[in-house]
């Protein structure tokens, strides 16, 4: 029974270890539940270094349908620049010429009629380019996994210093790119990727900080915005055969995993950090919300379909994701989940379930239950404490696995003790039967007792003279 018990326990142990290492979707979802719970419970702090210029419903209603003419963006840039922003980053790709450009419309009319030959109009593309040159602007790039037939030779503005293996071997790769027009990118101070990686349940929990797009290394929009805002030119990337080990600017260390992915620590983002784009156009806003802030220009309008769900349970505009990443980078506060935390998590997992295989079988049942509860509590407390220091260790799956092992171990202990109890009961039954048989044998060894009737009976008669003496006697029966 003992050998069979350990065979079953060993099989379950191996099964749990294998699925932990393989990490199939169901295990990922279990870990996501734990991760999201922490994000909701320990959602401390506030993003204060970023302001979002919001292309909202109000702006669409007053300015008109989207996309807008480029001179509107030019006006937004010029009005923002009056109040000394650290950097302005667009969450909008300008991949085509301005279709509402009066210059282009005039050229079309001039082809059809000579009446418009002497008319002069503004070239909104050029107006926008001029504003870009006067500003500290970061434009976006998007990774495209399929063939892209639009040739664009724009290259990263970031200067990369690589130590160790080539980072392109480890970071997320896209075959091609979608980005703004080359003349716009040339006028910008930086270019960063806005590609997001939703998890299997569609929630944004982590994003790459570096991308391999078109066989070139591009930073994320958030990282590029921080670089331009702080006046840095270089980014150090250190890697080895296991992947990315270090991403560092002059002022910030960015703890990513081996694939250059960071886990976002979401904080409170006050609605006051949003300014309607139309208010910027009309120059009707509080300048303190712009001064020395990193400005993101994006959209919260439902019609533009840039709404995502994040791990603290909220649904937010996609541009707000970049705001949280920027805050994490500036404060070195993103959640660390890398090779070291994974190894630590696996060691805790193994120790926990091994203990719960052997120890409960060696102590009394009531103490084994106390040990089990204590082990689960200790694992979760360790996970929570680690999270306070921005390290993520999943406690939910180890707790579930430990419960399975403990219940299985307890079940086999019950079977074993029940088997022993049944065996003892059989022995007691045999002993009882043997005692009964021995008693019967012993009875047969003693002589049989004569049945005595009316034992307490006497008859007193007068004394008789026998040879000169007098005697009394008692008659018990007729013969005695």
Protein language model annotation of sequence segments:
Residues 254-275:
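Active-site Gly/Thr loop motif
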Residues 423-480:
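… and, occasionally, acidic/histidine-rich disordered N-termini of signaling adaptors
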Residues 401-426:
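Juxtamembrane or sensor-core-proximal signal-transducing alpha helices
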Residues 389-403:
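Loop-to-transmembrane alpha-helix initiation sites
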Residues 2-252, 290-371:
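Non-transmembrane functional regions of envelope-associated proteins
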Residues 225, 322-325, 401-410, 441:
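Generic recognition of well-ordered alpha-helical segments
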Residues 16-20, 375-385:
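Aromatic-anchored segments of alpha-helical transmembrane domains
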Residues 368-378, 398-401:
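Central hydrophobic cores of alpha-helical transmembrane segments
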């Amino acid at each position: 029974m003992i050998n069979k018990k350990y065979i079953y326990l060993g099989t379950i142990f191996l099964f749990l270890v294998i699925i932990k290492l393989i990490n199939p979707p169901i295990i990922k979802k279990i870990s996501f539940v734990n991760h999201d719970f922490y994000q909701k419970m320990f959602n401390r702090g506030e993003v204060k270094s970023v302001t979002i210029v919001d292309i909202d419903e109000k702006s669409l209603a007053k300015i008109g349908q989207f996309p807008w003419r480029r001179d509107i963006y030019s006006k937004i840039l010029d009005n923002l620049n009056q109040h000394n922003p650290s950097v302005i980053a667009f969450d909008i790709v300008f991949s085509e010429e301005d279709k509402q450009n009066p210059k282009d419309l005039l050229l079309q009319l001039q082809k059809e009629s000579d009446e418009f030959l002497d008319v002069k109009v503004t070239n909104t593309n050029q107006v926008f380019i001029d504003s870009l040159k006067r500003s500290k602007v970061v434009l976006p790039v998007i990774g495209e996994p399929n063939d892209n037939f639009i040739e664009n030779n724009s290259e990263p503005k970031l200067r990369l210093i690589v130590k160790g293996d080539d980072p392109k071997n480890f970071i997320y790769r896209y075959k091609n790119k979608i980005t703004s027009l080359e003349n716009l990118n040339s006028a910008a101070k930086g270019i960063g990727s806005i590609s997001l990686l939703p998890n299997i349940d569609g929630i944004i929990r982590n994003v790459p900080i570096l991308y391999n797009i078109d066989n070139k290394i591009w930073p994320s929009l958030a990282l590029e915005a921080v670089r331009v805002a702080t006046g840095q030119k270089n980014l150090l990337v250190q890697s080895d055969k296991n992947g990315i080990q270090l991403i560092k600017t002059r002022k910030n260390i960015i703890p990513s995993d081996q694939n250059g992915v960071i886990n976002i620590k979401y904080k409170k983002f006050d609605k006051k950090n949003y300014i309607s784009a139309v208010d910027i156009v009309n120059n009707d806003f509080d300048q303190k919300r712009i001064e020395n802030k990193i400005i993101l220009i994006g959209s919260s309008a439902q019609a533009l379909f840039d709404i995502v769900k994040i791990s603290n349970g909220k649904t937010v505009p996609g541009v707000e994701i970049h705001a949280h990443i920027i805050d994490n980078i500036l404060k070195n506060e993103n959640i660390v989940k890398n090779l070291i935390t994974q190894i630590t998590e696996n060691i805790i997992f193994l120790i926990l379930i091994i203990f719960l295989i052997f120890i409960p079988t060696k102590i009394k049942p009531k103490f084994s239950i106390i040990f089990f509860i204590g082990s689960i509590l200790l694992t979760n407390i360790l996970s929570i404490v680690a999270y306070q220091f921005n390290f993520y260790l999943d406690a939910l799956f180890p707790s579930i696995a430990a419960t399975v092992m403990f219940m299985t171990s307890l079940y086999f202990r019950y079977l074993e003790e029940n088997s022993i109890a049944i065996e003892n009961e059989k022995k007691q039954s045999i002993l009882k039967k043997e005692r009964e048989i021995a008693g019967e044998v012993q009875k047969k060894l003693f002589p049989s007792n004569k049945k005595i009737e009316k034992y307490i009976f006497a008859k007193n008669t007068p004394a008789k003279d026998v040879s000169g003496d007098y005697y009394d006697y008692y008659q018990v029966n007729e013969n005695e």
